[in-house]
């Protein structure tokens, strides 16, 4: 068992314990820069018939970090070795922090995942193969994944925005946190590395909705 798998199991056990002790507390996870690809773009970058290789399960059921990596190339710079998340989607999307966007010269547009109309494009590369996206670069709006049962218990609904208190050595309250409800989800809040740095993020950190 590798370290990432062990951390995932620990997070799940902590969630069970915290859920039993305090129903309104949930795990907070920090997401680094990453890419979602369509099947067409996977084949364009890695070869015809190519399938992503799962390397690590993510906290959301069925989602995984793939072994494959890409270059994200902007007007003023690029990031190499950017992780691809699977499975393939119906649209390609690049998720960066605002700091990342400034570094490579791309406009940072804060959006819910999947809401890519009107967002900047970017060039993706693997070796001598490239894919030009005409849209799809977003700064992910901070959000909480939950089931319908979780939403009922926490008195929130899909698409609502809430305030979340972060329990850490640098406690703060995040405003405008999006609620995303689907029964295939597992309860957890997702923030990016800029947000994680602002609250002194550590693995296993928790949050709760402020009423």
Curated annotation (Swiss-Prot):
Cited NCBIfam families: BMC_EutD_Gpos (NF040837), PRK15070.1 (NF011652)
Pathway where it operates: Polyol metabolism; 1,2-propanediol degradation
Q: Tell me the function of this protein.
A: Involved in 1,2-propanediol (1,2-PD) utilization within the bacterial microcompartment (BMC) dedicated to 1,2-PD degradation by catalyzing the conversion of propanoyl-CoA to propanoyl-phosphate.
Mind telling me which GO cellular component terms the entry cites?
Answer: bacterial microcompartment
Give the record's cofactor note, including how many are bound: There are 2 Zn(2+) ions per monomer; Zn(2+) and CoA bind inbetween the 2 domains in each monomer.
Q: Does the keyword Membrane apply?
A: no
| Binding annotation for phosphate | 89
Report the EC code(s) recorded for this entry: 2.3.1.222
Which residues make up the binding site for CoA?
30-32, 76, 197
Binding, Zn(2+) 2: 143, 145, 190
This chain belongs to the protein called: Phosphate propanoyltransferase
Q: What class of enzyme is it?
A: transferase
Subcellular location per UniProt equals: Bacterial microcompartment
**Has UniProt tagged this entry with the keyword rRNA-binding?**
no
Gene for this protein? Answer: pduL
InterPro entries per the record?
Answer: PTAC (IPR008300)
What catalytic activity is recorded?
Answer: propanoyl-CoA + phosphate = propanoyl phosphate + CoA
* Co-factor requirement: Zn(2+)
Molecular function per GO: acyltransferase activity, transferring groups other than amino-acyl groups; metal ion binding
A Gene Ontology biological process in which this protein takes part is: propanediol catabolic process
What the record says about its domains? Formed by 2 beta-barrels, each is capped on both ends by short alpha-helices.
Q: Quick one: which residues bind Zn(2+) 1?
A: 34, 36, 95
> What family classification does the UniProt entry report for this protein?
Belongs to the PduL family.
Instruction: Give the UniProt keywords, A-Z.
Output: Acyltransferase, Bacterial microcompartment, Metal-binding, Transferase, Zinc
């Amino acid at each position: 068992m590798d370290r990432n798998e062990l951390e995932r199991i620990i997070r799940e056990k902590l969630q069970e314990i915290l859920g039993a002790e305090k129903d309104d507390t949930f795990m907070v996870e920090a997401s680094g820069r990453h890419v979602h690809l369509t099947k067409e773009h996977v084949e364009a970058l890695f070869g015809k018939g190519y399938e992503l290789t799962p390397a690590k399960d993510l906290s959301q059921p069925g989602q995984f970090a793939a072994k494959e990596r890409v270059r994200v190339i902007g007007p003023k710079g690029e990031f190499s070795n950017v992780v691809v998340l699977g499975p393939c989607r119906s649209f390609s999307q690049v998720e960066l922090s605002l700091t990342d966007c400034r570094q490579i010269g791309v406009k940072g547009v804060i959006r819910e995942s999947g809401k890519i109309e009107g967002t900047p494009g970017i060039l993706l590369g693997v070796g001598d193969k490239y894919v030009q996206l005409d849209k799809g670069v977003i700064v992910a709006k901070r959000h909480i994944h939950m089931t319908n049962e979780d939403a009922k218990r926490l008195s929130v609904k899909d698409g609502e925005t809430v305030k979340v208190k972060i329990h850490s050595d640098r406690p703060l309250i995040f405003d405008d946190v999006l609620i995303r409800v689907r029964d295939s989800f597992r309860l957890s809040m997702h923030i990016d590395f800029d947000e994680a740095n602002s609250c002194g993020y550590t693995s296993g950190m928790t949050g709760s909705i402020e009423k």
